[in-house]
Amino acid sequence: SKYATNCIHKEYLQFKKDLLGDLCTGNINYVEKNGFKGNPIYTLVSHRHPDITYIKNLDIESSLNLLDELGVALWFYDDGSLHKDKLFYNLNTQAYSEEINRDLFAPYLKEKYNIIAKPTIERKKDGREFWYLRISKFEGAYEISELLNKYPVQPYCYKTWSSETSQLWRKLQEELKSTNMENCSNKMKSCILKRLEQSM
């Protein structure tokens, strides 16, 4: 099998191409009109390789077990979005069932990265239902942002917290630890965070 991907950002495909090394020696191609809307896009295709075929044929649980930090970062670059005001992340896993989101994706993120991902339903006007993962600012959003910062991709810098927000978050953690309030409610954490923000 081959690995094929596309993106509106050429820099991101170059990042992936560098990771693929000898598996991908071709050029990044520009397509002037792509899809229904006819928007421009960049594409990248690897060589055929048995390792790609092997990974492609794995079940979801086995694929998750192969993921490292970089793999999770790419997952959020590809399918994640950050709410800039409320500082939570959505991971767009709507292609998968409620059961896969609940029983595979959420436990994996919790056990490996202490990211608490809540399966959330999206109901369409025509009655269709889709599930995705939501990660609140108090339950793993900081960890996601820090993970993305380990593997920076300039066009996607908007998917990470600002340095000021990260600094404020670290101050919150220090205060919670010093006052033995690490297990307090998210509402209480929000109040403390607001106070710290006002004092800066």
Question: Whereabouts are the PLM-identified features?
Answer:
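Internal intein/HINT superfamily modules and their associated LAGLIDADG
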Residues: 1-200
